[in-house]
Amino acid sequence: MPQLDPAPWFSMLTVSWLIIFLLIMPTILFYQPQNTISTKQVTKPKQSTWTWPWH
């Protein structure tokens, strides 16, 4: 069973995770959101019922 032999795929897995952690993650963590997070309580607007003349 070739899946049990870790020689061909384990090094590729390790290198790909190192690339993700060393190159991509710092770029993503450096990103700052443009909008500030609001702590204001969000309330749903009260909607009145719509009466439809059915006759």
From Swiss-Prot:
Main location: mitochondrion
Function comment: Mitochondrial membrane ATP synthase (F(1)F(0) ATP synthase or Complex V) produces ATP from ADP in the presence of a proton gradient across the membrane which is generated by electron transport complexes of the respiratory chain. F-type ATPases consist of two structural domains, F(1) - containing the extramembraneous catalytic core and F(0) - containing the membrane proton channel, linked together by a central stalk and a peripheral stalk. During catalysis, ATP synthesis in the catalytic domain of F(1) is coupled via a rotary mechanism of the central stalk subunits to proton translocation.
InterPro entries documented for this protein: ATP8_metazoa, ATPase_protein_8
GO terms assigned for molecular function: proton transmembrane transporter activity
PANTHER family membership: ATP SYNTHASE PROTEIN 8
GO biological process: one example: proton motive force-driven ATP synthesis
Similarity comment: Belongs to the ATPase protein 8 family.
Name of the featured protein: ATP synthase protein 8
Annotated localization: Mitochondrion membrane
Description of how the protein assembles with itself and partners: F-type ATPases have 2 components, CF(1) - the catalytic core - and CF(0) - the membrane proton channel.
Highest taxon, organism lineage: Eukaryota
Pfam families, alphabetized: ATP-synt_8
Membrane topology: Single-pass membrane protein
Species this protein is from: Petromyzon marinus (Sea lamprey)
Entry keyword set: ATP synthesis, CF(0), Hydrogen ion transport, Ion transport, Membrane, Mitochondrion, Transmembrane, Transmembrane helix, Transport
Transmembrane segments: 4-24
GO CC, any one term: proton-transporting ATP synthase complex
